[in-house]
């Protein structure tokens, strides 16, 4: 396998990871778990959490898995008391109710505080923890588990090299990559080298079933299932993709203690890149190899498109993630590369106006909307219908992707500030 394809695999493995719970509060839980390990105490006296505006925004309304509670305070507190510092995004996988009770007691005793800080970093979390005369600070920046510095009593004990301080959004920087190259890689790479991506299907399908079996969040998946059973909706490809994709997001945002396979630091975007592809593969009776190739196309395509703008912004990343999923649906249906590009163009034209107003249970509605667009756009593409040279949609797909990046980077920072101000009022 050539060096370029090896780079693609490393990119996927770097940003497509299992994650338990919404990754923004989990970043605080992880930092707290590491701080507790470095401090070497049983129970800290105080925990101070400082975060960027965007990390704060995405932690305000989402349940922390295994706790039944919302917010950064409980995430940091339970992470400090019972988190596994070696588990990264699955830091809270082994907590129990006693841990949650003890964590809530720390909060009730006003020993846990959270503050927003002014920083240019979109993903930033610093946890300072004290016990007796000792104080430890752990700082995460650029990625949800990317620790850049640890200090103990003011002395730096770990300082990440400069290359480790780059943000998740720069994973494609300096890499020769395009939609055509992603398509060719997905179709031609040796199956043994890419079959690891099938874990995404396993994890996110289990999460979807959890969302169907139990009531989480707005119960969108369960509602759609009931409508199908009543005959109000057809039991067809569109309805099943809507049902299972939103069910996975219901469980994810509702605090289920099952991991999602994330994409670009987002569990919901991992779901959006995975579940439409999995359900379509079942409908088309695709082989395991075809499913793996479609998932590679969807996940790497999503990573590539999102590399043109910051990982946290006012733009809902499920939209362009679903564009990559739609591309993969065309592949599974036997379409051409040109039709795959049509699908991407159609999705971005349809749903690129969706904003991110924080992580919460209603994100499952946006995931469902994006998945719906992915299916409709794939169907249009298979009929050789594509948006072109309208609005932000360029003459070809690479220009459209660059246009999305420009819109988010240059046009949406003020929107982001306005959303955060509204949510914080």
Curated annotation (Swiss-Prot):
Signal peptide region: none
Any one GO MF annotation of this record: L-cysteine desulfhydrase activity
Pfam families membership: SDH_alpha (PF03313)
InterPro entries (UniProt xref): Ser_deHydtase-like_asu (IPR005130), UPF0597 (IPR021144)
Domain of life: Bacteria
GO terms, biological process: L-cysteine catabolic process to pyruvate
Family: Belongs to the UPF0597 family.
Name of the protein: UPF0597 protein VIBHAR_03081
